[in-house]
Amino acid sequence: MAEQESLEFGKADFVLMDTVSMPEFMANLRLRFEKGRIYTFIGEVVVSVNPYKSLNIYGRDTIEQYKGRELYERPPHLFAIADAAYKAMKRRSKDTCIVISGESGAGKTEASKYIMQYIAAITNPSQRAEIERVKNMLLKSNCVLEAFGNAKTNRNDNSSRFGKYMDINFDFKGDPIGGHINNYLLEKSRVIVQQPGERSFHSFYQLLQGGSDQMLRSLHLQKSLSSYSYIHVGAQLKSSINDAAEFKVVADAMKVIGFKPEEIQTAYKILAAILHLGNLKFVVDGDTTLIEDGKLVSIIAELLSTKTDMVEKALLYRTVATGRDVIDKQHTEQEASYGRDAFAKAIYERLFCWIVSRINDIIAVKNSDTTIHGKNTVIGVLDIYGFEIFDNNSFEQFCINYCNEKLQQLFIQLVLKQEQEEYQREGIPWKHIDYFNNQIIVDLVEQQHKGIIAILDDACMNVGKVTDEMFLEALNSKLGKHGHFSSRKLCASDKILEFDRDFRIRHYAGDVVYSVVGFIDKNKDTLFQDFKRLMYNSSNPVLKNMWPEGKLSITEVTRRPLTAATLFKNSMIALVDNLASKEPYYVRCIKPNDMKSPQIFDDERCRHQVEYLGLLENVRVRRAGFAFRQTYEKFLHRYKMISEFTWPNHDLPSDKEAVKKLVEYCGFQDDVAYGKTKIFIRTPRTLFTLEELRAQMLVRIVLFLQKVWRGTLARMRYKRTKAALTIIRYYRRYKVKSYIHEVARRFHGIKTMRDYGKHVQWPTPPKVLHRFEEVLQAVFNRWRASQLIKTIPASDLPQVRAKVAAVEMLKGQRADLGLQRAWEGNYLASKPDTPQTSGTFVPVANELKRKDKYMNVLFSCHVRKVNRFSKVEDRAIFVTDRHLYKMDPTKQYKVMKTIPLYNLTGLSVSNGKDQLVVFHTKDNKDLIVCLFSKQPTHESRIGELVGVLVNHFKSEKRHLQVNVTNPVQCSLHGKKCTVSVETRLNQPQPDFTKNRSGFILSVPGN
């Protein structure tokens, strides 16, 4: 929802004034300044008045209020214009720029920083690390450039003494991916001299006030500002900037940006070398010029990583090449001082340009492929020096004010002139609005052959000694009739102008008197080649790379370089062309007073700025004109989805008719005009409403496209999956067939083999058939087993099954299972085993068969048993398919105990060769015995007993638990005990003895 300011703050947009007049404009501007509302709109132009105090209107909360909002929805603010430029760039994939203009001290630099801060804050919602790194470096670059390029002037404590234009590159998602900085005309003369009340660049004061004692000692510096000739003028001046604190901020910023420690140290060394250069004094001894303090030369040589004698020679001599001859021409004292100052200025300028270049290298767009990432778009931010009128205006002010004339001309061309011409060209009814066109002043300065710069260049190229006075005379003769140029010679009664020194230009911002003193010298920008060779031969690679032209041979003839004014003019023309190619947004900064006071609003001072900035004319054009215009084709391409008559394609006679239909459908026909090739929309609100309708339709279109595309993807995915499954199925079938064919080939004729194919190696199956191979091998093994079983007599099959059962239960857990011998089972009836008693046992067995009706005898054997009273006796066990009988062989095999097999829960045997076995019963009355044989002795029968019992239980589909352990756990009438087995050498036969935990079975040793 739109939020409007209360009327007590005046009109938030000058376009809304009741009458367009200077008094009402100024009254509204004053009211808003006094109420703390420093920003006011003129349509899409922001007028900013410097408050000269900190305001709490730039925090995160304020950023969120303006993020993604339209201009009319929020009160005027820099963030509103920044968001508008960002949205235009993102919506239309069109490069935009924000031009910040105004005179020195009007707040341009601060405005540019807040705009950068806003753009950084609203981008990269996904918090990508690389984007955050780029944003951080873009923001940090500001304070580094301010330290080396800004200075305190009489009008501004943080005045930009260079021009800066920064391009911020964005990817197709609108996130910053890099940038590039262009710098213009650093005021390097400030290095060696400043006007009263002003300082040199901040960097010198920050180094001296913020550098550690150890650092200053290494640079041979002391904290006293007044000790250095180049900066002593501003040594006692108070500044709102904390130099010591800023030193640390700048050093940290350089590290964050990516400057290497040795590069940062080189920058400090250059600053120190310049300060020491300023303290160099020259004396004359006869015809010889000497350096007063040779120690300073050594210090400078150390800081610049070169030799002392080379520094001294460069300061005192100039190498002149005449044909093949090379001579050293000694300087006069005046020439040496001039060379020293030129060297100091050049070193600082190279340092500054190198810093800008390094920042550009680091923040440059990397790995950006438009075919992959889409078109990169740009937002340009121009923060350049404002219009300046000082007590003494020299070459630098001339260039700065020319720059402002060019920017004003751009504003006139785009906002006032081109707009009105476009209305007439398109046939839109329009009443012409008069305005001052400063093209005549721009031509006065830059016109080929006739402009001031051309005349200055001609003077510099003349052979012989050319003076500034001669240059002024040339201006008088060639520009004497120009209405915006005058001098004392042309206007003898004007005593403000000095003879042979001053000339006046009537700029759009007011009359400025320039002193020609230094124009020739500053335009030539002479630096002897000796200094360039000196720096190129430095052992410091950073310094060496700053002076590539130093590698030229002494005798090499070079072309005359372009003059400083021409270089600046060319850069300004390129800058304006660059800005004109983008969609511009303007911030017009106004300085309320010259005292830097937050309370004073100087009406006359502000009115003058409003007049020369053309703000009133801007209001008139905006009120009478249209906020937006677009060709019918592009307009239709963007908004056609809003109307059913134009979506997806229209069938009307022309795009113009289609646009009319669309506008009427939306009900905006009263707010538009139709030109020959373009539609014109009067109010921004209509455009914003169109954008909202488009955004709503885009959601529906995107959902529809997503639905169709997802359906298409699903069908494609299904077809691919189905095809893949078909391929997999057929491939698996092929692999199975191949595998089975190979198995069939290898196992062909195994019935005739002696081992029925046991030696045949199985082929390696595919991974998917591993389980199949296991099943197939199991089938083969069962078949092979059946073939082997066929050879076994039927009478031996029960014994075989019992042995198999024993192996399954005991293999790997007991050493001797008795598998190699025949298992008789009923050993009590065997005469070899019991020759004396077998005849007695058989009748007892028959009687039990009659009585208990058992079918088969499973096992019988003599045993030694122990009971719960620790009594050990010889007994026998007789196991049938129904019962387990405990018998006394000494009493003709009298049955002492009968245990039904269904009451048997399991067996426990030890893991040794002993014959211990425990029969576990449900009533916890376990039977503990040790099997023994008489003939042969020590025959192992445990495997046989376990096998026949397990096999019998299996035939009845019951499970018999068999435990193999030592000691063996058992229960005698509910009492838990253990039976452990020990081997003793002198033990004649197995025997049980009592111990604390149960019993010990002692068996004979080997």
Curated annotation (Swiss-Prot):
Modified residues (Phosphotyrosine): 536
Domain Myosin motor intervals: 9-695
SMART domains with a match to the protein in the record: IQ, MYSc
Residues that bear Phosphoserine: 200
Keyword Iron-sulfur assigned: no
Protein's name according to its UniProt entry: Unconventional myosin-Id
Entry function: Unconventional myosin that functions as actin-based motor protein with ATPase activity. Plays a role in endosomal protein trafficking, and especially in the transfer of cargo proteins from early to recycling endosomes. Required for normal planar cell polarity in ciliated tracheal cells, for normal rotational polarity of cilia, and for coordinated, unidirectional ciliary movement in the trachea. Required for normal, polarized cilia organization in brain ependymal epithelial cells.
Localisation: Cytoplasm; Perikaryon; Cell projection, Dendrite; Early endosome
Organism the protein comes from: Bos taurus
